[in-house]
From Swiss-Prot:
One GO biological process term: cell adhesion
Position of the signal peptide: 1-21
Gene coding for it: faeC
Chief site of localization: other
Organism: Escherichia coli
Annotated InterPro entries: Adhesion_dom_fimbrial_sf, Adhesion_dom_sf, K88_fimbrial_pA
Subunit (UniProt): K88 fimbria, 0.1-1 micrometer in length and 7 nanometers in diameter, is composed of about 100 identical subunits.
Cysteine disulfide partners in this protein: C37-C84
Location in or out of the cell: Fimbrium
Keywords of the record: Disulfide bond, Fimbrium, Plasmid, Signal
Gene Ontology, cellular component aspect: pilus
Function recorded in the entry: Fimbriae (also called pili), polar filaments radiating from the surface of the bacterium to a length of 0.5-1.5 micrometers and numbering 100-300 per cell, enable bacteria to colonize the epithelium of specific host organs.
Record-given protein name: K88 fimbrial protein A
Length: 181
């Protein structure tokens, strides 16, 4: 009787004499990205701190003022080479332009010289999903993340003068936020 009881205990403790072994393999993958990138706006490729200065408009001739180019560059903290790997964590990168009052239906709002001058700002990169005039209704430009990770977005700005423009100086501002999703 003692033998049968001991055998039964061993049988139950070992799982009925049947042993199961399973190998499970779990693979994790992740993108490691820099968490902080900083922005530099180069005006006319001169590193002009994001300030564009347009030529003089002569109302008597009505000739347009030549456009000016500017580039938005992104750098990872401490880097001297442009690029922002943080975009690789998303699927689309977006530059969203304009705080309240900076854009209207005609473009970037300016003050001075009659207050009717607008600045037509457009993305020029082929990878931009929108290359029309930035306005209050169309103020976002999206890019593929592989392009955005290179850290360079190019734009062109051109002032548009109304017929009743007055002599004087004008100025405007356009802010933007860079995001990725």
């Amino acid at each position: 009787m003692k033998k049968a009881f001991l055998l039964a205990c061993v049988f139950f403790l070992t799982g009925g004499g049947v042993s199961h072994a399973a190998v499970q393999k779990t693979i994790f993958s992740a993108d490691v990205v820099a968490s902080v990138c900083h922005v530099v706006v180069d005006a006319d490729s001169t590193g002009n701190s994001g300030r564009l200065t347009f030529g003089t408009y002569r109302k008597s001739t009505g000739a347009s003022v030549p456009p000016r180019d500017f580039t938005v560059r992104l750098y990872e903290s401490g880097a001297t080479v442009q690029g922002c790997s943080a975009f690789l964590a998303g699927q689309v990168a977006t530059l969203d332009f304009g705080n309240p009052g900076q854009l209207d239906a005609a473009g970037v709002v300016t003050r001075g010289a009659g207050d009717g001058i607008r600045v037509d700002v457009r993305a020029v990169d082929a990878q931009a999903d929108y290359r029309g005039r930035l306005t209050q209704d169309n103020h976002s430009v999206k890019y593929p993340v592989d392009f955005a990770a290179k850290g360079q977005f190019r734009f062109r700005a051109q002032p548009v003068f109304p017929a009743d423009v007055k002599a004087g100086e004008y100025s405007g501002a356009l802010t933007f936020v860079v995001t990725y999703q």
